[in-house]
């Protein structure tokens, strides 16, 4: 809550600043992709406007142009219903939370439930509630320059990734399914 105003007024202020959140998220996500490219981590980009970003990256990152053309794919927007199949065919999903840093976004449980390691910036809630060995890997927004290297080392260890996937699926079934 903002000091001196009610919860309703706080919600109104947050809604007024919604586009600032969207802009900040876009800038952070672009930096993450830049770091993945610099570390030669193949990536598929889902969502809108990645084609515009990639056009700029091809101009600004000429040293990585061959890698970009071969290993960075823009897949466009997808529906929510398509996500389980996408996660099921991916080894990992890189997530950046909206600016509610005390909660969780459904991308993390959805990734884990579909056999995909979730790599995310995390939140106070996530770090408190989700054990380190549960298929979730955290990166720091304060150290975005290291995220590409971290992800590259994670995916290079195939055996460890398989273990993380198995633990993630189990954790998701235990904690986030209707079965419990």
Residue ranges and their predicted role:
Residues 1-30, 35, 39-54:
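Extended, charge-rich helix/loop segments that form flexible
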């Amino acid at each position: 809550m903002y000091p001196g105003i009610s919860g309703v007024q706080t919600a109104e202020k947050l809604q007024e600043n919604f586009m600032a959140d969207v802009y900040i998220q876009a800038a952070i996500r672009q930096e993450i992709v830049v770091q993945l490219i610099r570390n030669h981590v193949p990536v598929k980009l889902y969502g809108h406007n990645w084609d515009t970003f990639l056009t700029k990256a091809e101009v600004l990152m000429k040293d990585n142009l061959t890698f970009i053309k071969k290993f960075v794919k823009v897949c466009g927007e997808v529906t929510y219903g398509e996500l389980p199949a996408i996660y099921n065919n991916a080894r990992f999903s890189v997530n950046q939370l909206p600016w509610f840093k005390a909660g969780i976004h459904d991308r993390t449980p959805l990734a884990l439930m579909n056999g995909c390691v979730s790599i995310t910036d995390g939140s106070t809630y996530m770090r408190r509630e989700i054990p380190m060995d549960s298929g979730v890997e955290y990166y720091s927004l304060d150290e975005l320059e290291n995220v590409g290297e971290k992800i590259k080392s994670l995916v290079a260890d195939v055996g460890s990734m398989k273990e993380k996937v198995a633990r993630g699926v189990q954790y998701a079934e235990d904690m986030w399914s209707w079965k419990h």
